[in-house]
Amino acid sequence: MVVEKRNPIPVKEAIQRIVNQQSTMPAITVALEKSLNHILAEDIVATYDIPRFDKSPYDGFAIRSVDSQGASGQNRIEFKVIDHIGAGSVSDKLVGDHEAVRIMTGAQIPNGADAVVMFEQTIELEDTFTIRKPFSKNENISLKGEETTTGDVVLKKGQVINPGAIAVLATYGYAEVKVIKQPSVAVIATGSELLDVNDVLEDGKIRNSNGPMIRALAEKLGLEVGIYKTQQDDLDSGIQVVKEAMEKHDIVITTGGVSVGDFDYLPEIYKAVKAEVLFNKVAMRPGSVTTVAFADGKYLFGLSGNPSACFTGFELFVKPAVKHMCGALEVFPQIIKATLMEDFTKANPFTRFIRAKATLTSAGATVVPSGFNKSGAVVAIAHANCMVMLPGGSRGFKAGHTVDIILTESDAAEEELLL
């Protein structure tokens, strides 16, 4: 087999090549209660003002502000209570001179009133109360349309539907929501050295950990996942299973078979399915041999067979592709600053990603590597909630240095590619 020539490209360029492809999933309609974490397929426009009417944000008394002028501790002013309303009720009384309506939180302000006195600001008697301070017009009132007015875009196309967005959709009567269909993912682990999780260990063999990990990462994104039988290092069967997966799924992820060894067939498989290789080497560690191809609107990700490299490839490349396919406004990894809490002395000829544990406090973020950090390591992934990103050309970092980290357990993303 001829060894394929590979020229590494920067991580940022690799991500950009992925999202430059034209691949958008269709819009579908789902029930409101099923819409969580989907991407909106259209703008949601306010069809009425919020609040719909002037209302009270407190329990208290609705009064005319003019009647409170001159009130003080030495000159308490008395009001007569003429009605009592709760949320959902509307008073039919017109508030007159030194009159008041007892009002509960959320109730509509009665005609004539333009201020609300909270109960704790009064001394109550049987059907009267007194106050000791003046109130201004619209004091303690939530005004009609102060949050949003008719015609405002309240949710944007491409926005992730979170619990707050569901509240907005329910407010405007959306029992069904138009969203972008989420892509389905095929996961194919390759390698004659792999055993299934229930198999007895043999000399020279290891259990397949990448397949279950990638499945979990994809399902965490809410994606439908198809798991394919572990593939031996055989070109013909590899071509067949990738073709089958492409017929049924929008994304095909293979693990292993991307290096330059005698039994790494992925480049030949991509040729056989007529896929355009976007890149086949990235200037990073681990996962430099990560390969991504594109065919018929579908992504084919060739992730490393080494667990840490496989995990890194999913976080950096698969996640943005999924968000891009769903038309998300925010696609790219979110990067924050953190203080490194222990030395990392290894030189970094290329951008290095370290599985790590971040702690966020009021004083800022700190981070420490989560364990053994070679590309084949697996335990460190289980204890990580982020990846430290060390720039290429650096010669190690000391405790106390500020570093960039990507929060892998966070759903947050950026509109701009900051890597």
Curated annotation (Swiss-Prot):
Pathway: Cofactor biosynthesis; molybdopterin biosynthesis. It holds the Pfam family MoeA_C. GO terms for molecular function: metal ion binding; molybdopterin molybdotransferase activity. One of its GO terms (biological process) is Mo-molybdopterin cofactor biosynthetic process. Keywords: Magnesium, Metal-binding, Molybdenum, Molybdenum cofactor biosynthesis, Transferase. This is Molybdopterin molybdenumtransferase. It comes from the Bacteria. Belongs to the MoeA family. Binds 1 Mg(2+) ion per subunit. Catalyzes the insertion of molybdate into adenylated molybdopterin with the concomitant release of AMP. It comes from Staphylococcus aureus (strain MRSA252). Its EC number is 2.10.1.1. It catalyses: adenylyl-molybdopterin + molybdate = Mo-molybdopterin + AMP + H(+). GO terms for cellular component: cytosol. PANTHER family: GEPHYRIN, MOLYBDOPTERIN BIOSYNTHESIS PROTEIN.
